[in-house]
Amino acid sequence: TQVGSSAASDVYKRQQVDEVIVPPRDAKTFNVKSGNFFRIESIEGPQVGDLNIFQADNLNEKFYSGKTRALYGTHISVGDKMFSSFPYLRSLATITWDTLDWYGYDKDGGSVHDVIGTRCDPYTYKLTSNNDYHYCCHSNLTRALVKERNIKLDEAEKIVHDVLNVFMLTGFTNDTKQYFMKSSPVRPGDYLEFFAETDLLGALSACPGGDCGSEHSSDVAKCYPLKVSIWDVDKKFLEGIKNSKISSYNRDHGLTD
């Protein structure tokens, strides 16, 4: 039994210590202590989420989706780590449980939890439609950092980064290799769970695309809230597990050779 599973809750004496509900077309932030678990859960209907994570004491150290993709592939699941940006390059969190791991890859090459889509944003929407829309995931995440963390708008927007698309069903087309989205298979009760390997600040947007099977970056799609729950575990089961360490590279870059 894996530590992150529901079946393991009693064995490892886990206790829920916090909970955040993310409203549709909005974002919320949350804190996770090193050694705790956090779970992103569908609670009312099919809904995808765009996840940013930061090292809680240094928001310049943030999730690096490109490096995570290079190490694991286009989609991630149980056992895969979410690596941080240069010059830190360490695991921020590890996925410990995934109720959608049964989906695998479909005949079109689609799968869930991708690290290939960047996030919906108002700039691309303006470019392609010449309209303004303020509730794309990029804006939602920026707004949450400004409102809940008292970060200036320009600073917040600069640290919002390419996301883990939680529950999102995506891939590349077989013929043109273009990015595609399909309706997510997620249903209420499904969740993706993580183990925090350092103190984390998370930010999660409930995407305006809903299950991302139709309209995107608008108010057309039916959207639902997402739940983030934080879990503590009896520390005797974590003996020998230490915080992840930042890269030991000396950052000389050949200048003293």
Where does each model-flagged region fall?
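Single conserved hydrophobic/aromatic residue that forms the stacking wall/gate
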Residues: 1-8, 12
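Noncatalytic modules at the cell exterior or secretory-pathway interfaces
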Residues: 32-40, 192-209
